[in-house]
């Protein structure tokens, strides 16, 4: 795990921990590294899990799919991001999301049940890690609240402007990249891609924005 320490140090989950403490914690939570090719499922809706995933490399999409193949993207996870935390922290919870590899990726699986029970080595940094987990979960709630704000808008135009405005504020810049391609953005905002493309074209003609691929 030594080679992944630069990634782990940057994660909010490990904030305030030394390298030795991080390595000790990985042992406590039965950390296991897996690799998955593009298009494969890491978690499937309908299953349950005791582990959460930490992206070491590559990217994944957290999605919801119905029986007719309609897809709703909840979030995109890149290097250093987590997925599955709420389900792993809730014993017996059934996943209503799936996690799919957007590209070849390396993932570290962490057993949250081991974290939430008494640490067998009684490590001093165990409580700090639990506080960090609470912070990670709270941040995830804020991200989903943002999505609700965007998709609750009445029109495709309003959804686009809500999302792009929020991204501009988040990145503190009027020029920014978004993590989605056009189809993914449509799936994230729960709109039809064709209708979204029409609105983007109108917004450009009106001088409200300039866009090329995922850059605005």
Show which residues each predicted segment covers:
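Short phosphate-coordinating micro-motif centered on Lys-Gly-acidic
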Residues: 41-47
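Cyclic-nucleotide recognition modules
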Residues: 73-131
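Cyclic nucleotide-binding regulatory module and flanking cytosolic helices
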Residues: 1-38, 87-91
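Phosphate-/nucleic-acid-contacting segments
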Residues: 154-216
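A short beta-strand-loop-beta hairpin characteristic of the jelly-roll/cupin
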Residues: 60-72
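A small-molecule sensor/coupling module
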Residues: 22, 95, 113-155
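Glycine- and acidic-residue-biased ligand/ion/polar-headgroup-sensing regions
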Residues: 39, 50-63, 78-80
């Amino acid at each position: 795990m030594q080679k992944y320490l630069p990634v782990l140090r940057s994660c909010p989950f490990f904030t305030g921990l030394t390298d030795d403490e991080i390595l000790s914690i990985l042992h406590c939570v039965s950390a296991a590294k897996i690799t998955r090719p593009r298009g494969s499922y890491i978690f499937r809706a309908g299953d349950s899990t005791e582990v959460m995933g930490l992206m070491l490399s590559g990217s994944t999409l957290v999605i919801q799919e119905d029986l007719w193949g309609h897809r709703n993207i909840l979030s995109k996870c890149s290097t250093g991001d987590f997925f599955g935390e709420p389900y792993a922290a809730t014993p017996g919870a059934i996943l209503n999301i799936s996690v799919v590899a957007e590209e070849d990726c390396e993932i570290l699986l962490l057993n949250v049940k081991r974290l939430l029970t008494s640490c067998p080595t009684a490590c001093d940094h165990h409580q700090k890690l639990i506080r960090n987990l609470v912070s990670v979960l709270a941040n995830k709630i804020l991200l989903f609240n943002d999505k609700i704000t965007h998709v609750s808008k009445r029109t495709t135009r309003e959804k686009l402007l809500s999302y792009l405005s929020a991204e501009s504020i988040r990145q503190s810049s009027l020029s920014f990249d978004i993590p989605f391609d056009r189809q993914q953005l449509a799936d994230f905002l729960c709109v039809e891609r064709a209708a979204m493309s029409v609105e983007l074209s109108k917004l450009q003609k009106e001088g409200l924005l300039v866009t090329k691929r995922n850059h605005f």
